[in-house]
């Protein structure tokens, strides 16, 4: 877009750091929450997630999908969302994982299709989790 080509997009992003988004954004071609909806949707998401006593792998993925669909910040939502997933896996003794660039398209498909087919995202995450487990095995770290 013209704003970014003139270098003004980055100026706006710096001003919005730490705040919820002020202008609409998108992820992987999917619509996200409008700026005026973000606070309520985030409150609902956090209340729902924190209301669960124990979280499992699917709960963490479900939270992530919902977070990404809200896309609460102007920029950095993917990194923040994936970092939250990593942290939650550690918190609940689930082997964490990192979505690498070569699997991003499968990851985005998984986000998009979550409501119809959870397997796309689940399988993508389990694949990279297996890679992480191989590193743990190599260094003889129990999990």
Give residue ranges: language-model regions:
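Single conserved hydrophobic/aromatic residue that forms the stacking wall/gate
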Residues: 1-12
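Feature targets compositionally biased, intrinsically disordered low-complexity regions
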Residues: 6-8, 17, 27-28
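Proline-centered turn/helix-capping motifs that create local helix->coil transitions or kinks
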Residues: 13-19
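Conserved catalytic-core motifs characterized by acidic clusters
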Residues: 22
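Phosphate/pyrophosphate-binding active-site loops
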Residues: 25-143
């Amino acid at each position: 877009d013209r704003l970014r080509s003139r270098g003004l997009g980055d100026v706006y992003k710096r001003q919005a750091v730490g705040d919820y988004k002020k202008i609409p954004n998108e992820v992987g071609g999917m619509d996200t929450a409008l700026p005026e909806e973000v606070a309520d949707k985030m409150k609902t998401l956090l209340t729902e997630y924190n209301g669960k006593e124990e979280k499992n792998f699917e709960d963490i993925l479900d939270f992530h999908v919902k977070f990404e669909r809200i896309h609460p910040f102007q920029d950095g939502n993917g990194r923040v969302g994936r970092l939250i997933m990593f942290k939650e896996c550690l918190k609940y003794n689930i082997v964490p994982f990192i979505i690498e660039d070569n699997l991003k398209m499968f990851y985005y498909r998984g986000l998009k299709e979550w409501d119809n087919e959870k397997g796309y995202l689940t399988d993508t995450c389990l694949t990279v989790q297996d890679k992480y487990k191989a590193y743990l095995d190599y260094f003889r770290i129990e999990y």
